Amino acid sequence: AMVSFLHYWALTEFIGLADHLGEWEDAKKYKAAAQHVKEVCNRELWDGEWFIRGITASGRKIGCQEDAEGRVHLESNAWAVLSGAADAEKADAALQAIDEYLYTPYGLLLNTPSYTVPDDDIGFVTRVYPGLKENGAIFSHPNPWAWAAACVRGRGDLAMKFYDALCPYWQNDKIEFRESEPYSYCQFIAGKDHSAYGRARHPFMTGSGGWSYFAATRYMLGIRPDYDELKIDPCIPADWKSFRATRVFRGASYEIIVNNPDGVMKGVKEIRIDGVPSDRIKPSRTGSRHVVEVTL
């Protein structure tokens, strides 16, 4: 299922590129394909409360409500929302399922409950020791996908909750048990179905550092480049009053000041560049410096 949602996301990216280049026939083709993929995903992969993980070669669904083990999975539900493929109501329900079933104080479980019986129809994951690595652990790499997904739905509170849980810094008072540095993401943390629940393993051996930075800066802080502009669309906890960030975009430096006087989680009310109201942040001269004030 995750790959189906990635397919949809890739198609939407191609649509944006085709529109930018004026390739209207390509854009039309990709839009039709994306709509088809979206309809099929919402029809075939939705299980009533969350999205399933996949379908085996024999036609059996993985990660559905009838499953005693491996009922809820992180990757498919996060990407259903992050890609934009999920209908609004389903997207909110998928986030709720992630929060309700997969959240732990150490991060989000990859799946739950862990598999305890080998099942070759499903595959390798059912032979991994319960609560470790791919079988019910807090696998770091996919966690940031859920942070970004929460931001897509305007849930800055949920994004921050998920971010804080995985952040190594907040686990440093448990260092004797965690057995990992407070400045490194780990490949995984033992899940709740393991006797060493909360113990981290394989620091630095993970792609989660890059994904964490990507999700935190481009979705939570909401600062991300586009073809013709630098976009700023934060999604933060309502109790954040302000934040600052510096972003170099195509050779120019932007000092970004975001103020949140009304205590909202998402929604830009006004942008000022060097004191002048603007609706877009266009590329500027290389070496130039600018102050961007954003009011939510």
Kindly label every feature range from the protein language model.
Residues 3-6, 33, 64-74, 86-90, ...:
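Secondary-structure capping and boundary motifs in well-ordered enzyme cores
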